[in-house]
């Protein structure tokens, strides 16, 4: 809120927006920060601390009126996660005129977008970001899948096993662009994988994994003799993920569907291996 407006105007509009969202969508998806930033960096830090304590991993900055462009964009700058901006449309009186001649927050949104650019802050702004409580609730709901994608990428590690095969250019991933997306990469030698695979020989969990594979394959189980090897390989990858995911919450495996040392592994490596466990995606080139 600007300090030339009553703070209660923004607070009431914020409450109406949150109530509109809860009435139409999943109430567990949204948290209402009680701090109203009134042209104050101190308020901004209080709001940042509050949403961190609440465990929020995405942020919507709502301009209840023109909005203080400095502190509101600082909040987006300091928040570590996907963020969006929306703004309040002016309520109208019964005769269609603006209540007490007040304007809406479109002007503040223009200033906010300019300040975000100056700060090199990437934020999602809807095509027309000014609306009623119900309209802004719809905008937030449309942002959720975007926020999930951004959050997932920034917490993802792709574990690959090489060398990358000759004549498969698509396998030679442009790592720089993955880094730009916030994705972490761990490239390993297939010899490392082979060593880990051998260490899982005779693993006591293999029979249980084989049973799971047999159940999924059903009548399609044409080569039951290779299932123990496949189970051994699956456990190798699952343990590798647990030992190597580091600070990341999500992991995907990128490998080749046939190993360079196929005679040593005693099998090829189909991409569906980990699908039966429901643990994580494992894809080939």
Can you annotate each of these PLM segments?
Residues 248-285:
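Glycine-rich anion/phosphate-binding loop at the beta-strand->alpha-helix junction
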Residues 1-113, 117-151, 155-159, 164-254:
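Metallocofactor- and cofactor-centric catalytic cores in central/energy metabolism, strongly enriched
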